[in-house]
């Protein structure tokens, strides 16, 4: 079984549930459970996982969340007595000081804004990651910072890892970064959030 909300899911499963209009795979999992008339099987632990999936894929409900159904599902999960503030804190307020220092370094030294192209990007070398005691997850969300600059509609984050450069793309509006990632960087993703290498 494959449950995915990304465009062009892999074709390896006997049964696929795919819908790119939903906020997250967690939302699809909820709907799948609901379709089996098994809503009562969602206990607090499952509800916490589904809520965390929706929370992270929507950037705390700041994107991929214009469908009222996303909020209806979140409300159903809250009825399971989950602690949404605890979930938020564990995801977004749980970073090491080294991550904060790396972010400051990237925003001050490594950011590039190309106003004429409406593009901003950050690049980080393997050595720089080591210098800041990088652990997986430390660069989560860095790609979004250039989009906060007025007039910027596309952002990218380039991270050197061993023999490859990992790339994350974000965009606003009609700029389809998933097509860029697919065509040039062996990647893919959503229209406004994609990656490649």
Where do the language-model regions lie?
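N-terminal small/polar loop signature for handling phosphorylated ligands or for N-terminal nucleophile
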Residues: 1
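Short alpha-helices
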Residues: 5-73
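Hydrophobic helix-and-loop "lid/oligomerization" segment in the mid-to-C-terminal part
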Residues: 55-184, 189-197
């Amino acid at each position: 079984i494959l449950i995915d909300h990304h465009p062009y899911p892999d074709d390896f499963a006997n049964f696929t549930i795919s819908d790119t209009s939903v906020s997250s795979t967690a939302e699809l999992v909820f709907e799948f459970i609901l379709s089996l008339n098994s809503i009562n099987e969602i206990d607090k632990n499952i509800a916490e996982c589904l809520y965390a999936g929706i929370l992270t894929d929507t950037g705390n409900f700041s994107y991929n969340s214009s469908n009222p159904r996303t909020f209806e599902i979140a409300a159903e999960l809250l009825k399971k007595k989950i602690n949404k503030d605890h979930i938020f804190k564990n995801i977004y307020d749980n970073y090491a000081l080294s991550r904060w220092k790396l972010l400051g370094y990237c925003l001050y030294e490594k950011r590039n804004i190309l106003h004429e192209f409406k593009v901003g990007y950050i690049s980080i070398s393997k050595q720089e990651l080591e210098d800041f005691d990088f652990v997986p997850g430390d660069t989560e969300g860095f790609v979004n910072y250039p989009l906060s600059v007025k007039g910027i509609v596309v952002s990218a984050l380039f991270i050197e890892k061993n023999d490859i450069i990992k790339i994350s793309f974000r965009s606003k509006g009609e700029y389809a970064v998933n097509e860029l990632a697919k065509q040039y960087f062996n990647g893919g993703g959503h229209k406004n959030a994609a990656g490649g290498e």
